[in-house]
A protein has these predicted regions:
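Sec-dependent N-terminal signal peptides
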Residues: 3-11
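A beta-rich soluble binding module of mature secreted/lumenal proteins
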Residues: 13-180
Length: 180
């Protein structure tokens, strides 16, 4: 999702009214707090479609609603990534395709050929037991998301996901819910 940044920044996306944008290099977590990826991460269970239900404000997703990420296996260590951003009226704004290399338990490096910034750290910090909800972050604290298999997230899983972000040093006051 981070690499969606370049496409949307270059396209000059505008924020929705009242939406905080954040800077490209804004940090949303205390980087002195250790960040922990999911040790028992099962990539095959992570595959499929995820809905972005919450995120930290970043320019590359300014104005995006109904954001989805689709993951499919390429081989044992590589996952295809397709991120879709929609306009508030539901029309498709942008789609970006890339790959994620598994570099450790719950740790991926995501790259998009059309983006000149190189690979980005994408750490799965937590999933619920059924892989219905996931928390994703980055050691540099410049991004973070709560993903869910359905557009609506149950309150108990949202609460658990927020606790994971807090545990990993993220500022919960800056987390914004995403309209589906």
């Amino acid at each position: 999702m981070r690499a969606l940044a370049a496409v949307l920044v270059l396209a000059g996306c505008a924020a929705l009214p009242g939406e905080e944008v954040g800077g490209l290099f804004e940090v949303y977590r205390d980087t002195d707090v250790p960040i922990v990826s999911k040790a028992l991460f099962e990539p095959e269970r992570y595959l499929g479609t995820w809905y972005e239900v919450a995120r930290y404000p970043v320019p590359f997703e300014a104005g995006c609603v109904g954001v989805t990420a689709e993951y499919a296996a390429i081989d044992a260590e590589t996952i295809s990534v397709k991120n879709t951003c929609r306009n508030p009226d539901g029309s498709e704004r942008s789609v970006i395709d890339g790959t994620a290399e598994i570099v450790g338990p719950g740790r991926l490096e995501v790259s998009f050929p059309s983006v000149p910034f190189g690979a980005a750290d994408y750490w799965v910090l937590w999933t619920d037991e059924g892989y219905r909800t996931a928390v994703v972050g980055a050691p540099n604290g410049r991004s973070g998301w709560i993903l869910n298999r359905d557009p609506e997230i149950p309150e108990d899983r949202l609460k658990a996901a927020r606790e994971v972000l807090d545990f990993n040093g993220y500022d919960l006051d800056r987390l914004m819910m995403v309209r589906q």
